[in-house]
């Protein structure tokens, strides 16, 4: 699902809320999440999951086209860990 599809789904399930308000709410939520991660904070949404940063050490990688070795610098990457309730909903058919 894309951000546009999310906004459309929310608009169809909430016909009394103006589309512009829904767009702004989604954008504001995503901006708040991004800012929190940018500041090194952990975000926890109970029942859904948590977002945090994981540190990746520098390493030597390879260019997939040429096979040439490439130095990859150390960096932080966003990480999502699904919560118990989300895991259960996703695995309802297993």
Swiss-Prot record:
Which keywords does this Swiss-Prot/TrEMBL entry list?
A: DNA recombination, DNA-binding, Transcription, Transcription regulation, Translation regulation
What domain of life does the UniProt record list for this protein's source?
A: Bacteria
Coiled-coil regions listed in the entry? none
UniProt cross-references to InterPro entries, sorted A to Z: Hist_DNA-bd, Histone-like_DNA-bd_CS, IHF-like_DNA-bd_dom_sf, IHF_beta
Q: How does it assemble?
A: Heterodimer of an alpha and a beta chain.
UniProt function note: This protein is one of the two subunits of integration host factor, a specific DNA-binding protein that functions in genetic recombination as well as in transcriptional and translational control.
PANTHER family recorded = DNA-BINDING PROTEIN HU (PTHR33175), INTEGRATION HOST FACTOR SUBUNIT BETA (PTHR33175:SF5)
Gene Ontology molecular function: DNA binding; structural constituent of chromatin
One GO CC annotation, please? chromosome
Put simply, this protein is called Integration host factor subunit beta
> Family per UniProt?
Belongs to the bacterial histone-like protein family.
Q: Can you name the source organism?
A: Histophilus somni (strain 2336) (Haemophilus somnus)
- Name the GO terms of the biological process aspect: DNA recombination; regulation of DNA-templated transcription; regulation of translation
